[in-house]
């Protein structure tokens, strides 16, 4: 089983990926991204989907028009792992590249 992030690793992650919040009901992080329109949101989701498939680590997400809600957690570890941290970093880059607000 993959180890979950320790407290220092979590602090470092939150410093790198602003706006993500720890969910109170489980060991997962969440963030909402807003884009100019549906095409921009879908383009962002496509970039994330390709990376997630390469990593074999998939987000939980929900999309309505220009908004994308993303939750990350490693189900096998029952919590946050380095895979969530790596994907969150990529998601931040992808969001900036597609004009997220």
Curated annotation (Swiss-Prot):
Q: Show the catalytic activity.
A: (4aS,6R)-4a-hydroxy-L-erythro-5,6,7,8-tetrahydrobiopterin = (6R)-L-erythro-6,7-dihydrobiopterin + H2O
Q: Does the keyword Lyase apply?
A: yes
Entry keywords, A to Z = Lyase
The answer, when asked if Lyase is one of the entry's keywords, is: yes
Matching Pfam families: Pterin_4a
Q: Name one GO molecular function term.
A: 4-alpha-hydroxytetrahydrobiopterin dehydratase activity
Q: Which Gene3D superfamilies match?
A: Transcriptional coactivator/pterin dehydratase
- As recorded in UniProt, its EC number(s) are 4.2.1.96
Q: Which GO terms describe its biological process?
A: tetrahydrobiopterin biosynthetic process
Its family remark reads: Belongs to the pterin-4-alpha-carbinolamine dehydratase family.
**Which NCBIfam families would you find in this protein's record?**
PRK00823.1-3, PRK00823.1-5
Q: Supply the PANTHER family for this chain.
A: PTERIN-4-ALPHA-CARBINOLAMINE DEHYDRATASE (PTHR12599:SF0)
Name of the protein described by the UniProt record: Putative pterin-4-alpha-carbinolamine dehydratase
Instruction: Specify the species.
Output: Ralstonia pickettii (strain 12J)
UniProt lineage: Bacteria, Pseudomonadati, Pseudomonadota, Betaproteobacteria, Burkholderiales
